[in-house]
């Protein structure tokens, strides 16, 4: 690759590092033995108030294509006609170019691209660390001036373009970071391909590690690095940057004698409920016998990196965890002043007091479900929905499909667009907050039955596609998957358009069908009212 513009990257890196730090995401990587149907999963809730809303299909590029390496190529960018039209937005900078050495894979492109036509899927969680602690200051000094040319957006794009398996993606991304360097905050990238699930953590400079998720286990991360063990000479299960220990010793990050723990060495993270409490509720949902303590400081350092679930999981199970706001615990965000009289879990103020997995600022949620028993064209399934998980839906997308409905490529946050998929859900989300306790029942009535049917339908459609592919009718199979996916996406768009009308009619001004008498406030609100302002219902 050409490095003529790398000097520019370093000059501007300090300004750009903060851009990715906006994100605040929760991810799961699920081994095939931990799921009911033997699929692997890689998930991502893209939680931010500034992320791009749109999703595109990036077509395969033939061998010999000139490919740009772009830093921060998301804000205001337009990939609708990429690569014929290269619009990298207001911040995007081309720092390098290379020539493709293979026909690249088609993939689903978003703020963080997530699925290709081979069934390789990934997500990410930006990792914070304590920059003011003694270890944090050493980390800052160690990585200062070592900014490279790859950020997380570009690394995921290029891996999906060029890799077919999770292991290949780990090796490919690791080689790029080793040679060309990292530019951005530390990241935790979860990856799966139907056979294996991996976690790839990159900390800065040329330093990274990757661990395979045991087949019977699940990994979860919430904005902090979590690979808390180190294994040498086992590349089938653990890989890392060359000279990683030497780098740690030379920069005073490790004494060379104690246990070498990558996440605490390169991304030191003190007890902070913002992240640890999300991980706690997720892991306890998967295995209640873990007996993890969400309050005692520093015990989270000993939390398991991987959890074997008490019961094998489904997509619905993971979706339910994404909708969690600490119900049934002392941290329930609806049982606070921010929950209001109707138990609203989506008040923006709650993120600063009790950060839940379910968040008002979730741009989109994706749950990749990849089953290696199916042909590539049929296995590359990802479940997608815009907005807060508790009120959104999931619709099936395939990395192999040949088109997307128009509403996927529309929408910006500042301008209401009734034809945008994100805005379509955002209206429902906002209206549900008027009287959440009642409105969520309307959401469930419109959504849950359809999703149950859809899970079964999609599995059946995949089997039909597999049969067609087995008969040599691959184009026919892909056309069927495309038509089915687009039909479901349009169905959900119409359903939520109608649901918005229902919510507005039912709960305008907090009433129920225009009736303000007999409104049911939460017990918390009634008790608060009685103690602070006198009983008022």
Predicted regions and their residues:
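Histidine-centered catalytic/metal-binding microenvironments
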Residues: 446-537
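Substrate-recognition/cap regions that form aromatic- and gly/pro-loop-enriched pockets
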Residues: 339-471
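Glycine-rich, aromatic-lined ligand/substrate-binding cores of catalytic
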Residues: 247-381, 385
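Hydrophobic core
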Residues: 12-20
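Short, well-ordered beta-strand elements within core beta-sheets of diverse protein domains
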Residues: 156-162
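Bacterial N-terminal signal peptides that target proteins for export
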Residues: 1-9
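A contiguous strand-loop segment
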Residues: 25-152, 172-305, 309-313
């Amino acid at each position: 690759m050409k490095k003529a513009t790398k000097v520019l990257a370093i000059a501007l890196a300090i300004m750009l590092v903060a851009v990715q730090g906006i994100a605040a995401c929760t991810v799961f990587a699920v081994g095939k033995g931990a799921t009911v149907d033997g699929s692997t999963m890689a998930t991502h809730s893209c939680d931010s108030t500034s992320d791009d809303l749109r999703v595109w299909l990036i077509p395969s590029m033939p061998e010999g294509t000139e490919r740009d390496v772009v830093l921060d190529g998301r804000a205001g960018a337009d990939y609708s006609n990429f690569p014929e039209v290269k619009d990298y937005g207001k911040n995007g900078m081309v720092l390098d170019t290379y020539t493709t050495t293979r026909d690249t894979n088609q993939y689903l492109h978003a703020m963080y691209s997530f699925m290709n036509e081979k069934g390789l899927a990934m997500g990410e969680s930006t990792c914070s660390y304590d920059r003011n602690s003694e270890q944090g200051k050493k980390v800052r000094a160690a990585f200062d001036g070592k900014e490279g040319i790859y950020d997380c957006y570009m690394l995921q794009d290029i891996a999906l373009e060029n890799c077919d398996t999770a292991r290949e993606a780990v090796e490919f991304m690791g080689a790029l970071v080793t040679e060309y360097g990292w530019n951005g905050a530390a990241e935790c990238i979860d990856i799966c391909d139907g056979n294996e699930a991996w976690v790839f953590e990159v900390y800065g400079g040329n330093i990274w590690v990757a661990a395979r998720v045991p087949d019977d286990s699940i990994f979860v991360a919430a904005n902090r690095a979590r690979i808390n063990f180190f294994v040498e000479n086992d590349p089938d299960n653990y890989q890392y940057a060359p000279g990683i220990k030497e780098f740690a010793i030379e920069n005073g990050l490790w004494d060379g004698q104690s246990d070498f723990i990558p996440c605490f060495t390169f991304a030191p993270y003190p007890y902070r409920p913002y992240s640890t409490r999300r991980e706690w509720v997720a892991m306890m949902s998967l295995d209640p016998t873990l007996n993890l303590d969400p309050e005692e400081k520093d015990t989270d350092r000993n939390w398991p990196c991987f959890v074997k679930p008490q019961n094998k999981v489904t997509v619905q199970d993971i979706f339910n965890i994404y909708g969690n706001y600490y119900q049934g615990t002392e941290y329930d965000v609806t049982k606070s002043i921010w929950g209001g009289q109707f138990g609203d879990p989506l008040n923006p103020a709650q993120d600063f007091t009790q950060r839940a997995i379910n968040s008002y600022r979730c741009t989109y949620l994706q749950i990749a479900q990849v089953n290696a028993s199916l042909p590539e064209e049929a296995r590359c399934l990802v479940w997608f929905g815009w907005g807060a998980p508790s009120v959104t839906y999931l619709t099936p997308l395939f990395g192999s499909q040949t088109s997307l409905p128009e509403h996927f490529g529309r929408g910006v946050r500042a301008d209401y667009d009734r034809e945008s998929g994100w805005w379509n859900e955002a209206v429902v989300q906002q209206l549900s907050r008027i009287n959440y306790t009642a409105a969520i029942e309307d959401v469930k009535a419109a959504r849950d039955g359809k999703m149950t049917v859809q899970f079964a339908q999609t599995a059946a459609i995949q089997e039909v596609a597999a049969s067609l592919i087995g008969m040599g009718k691959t184009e026919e199979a892909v056309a069927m998957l495309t038509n089915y996916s687009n039909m479901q996406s349009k169905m959900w768009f119409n359903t939520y358009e109608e649901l918005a009308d229902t919510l507005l009619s039912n709960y305008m001004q907090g009433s129920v069908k225009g009736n303000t008498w007999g409104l049911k406030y939460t017990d918390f609100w009634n008790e608060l009212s009685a103690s602070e302002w006198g009983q008022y219902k």
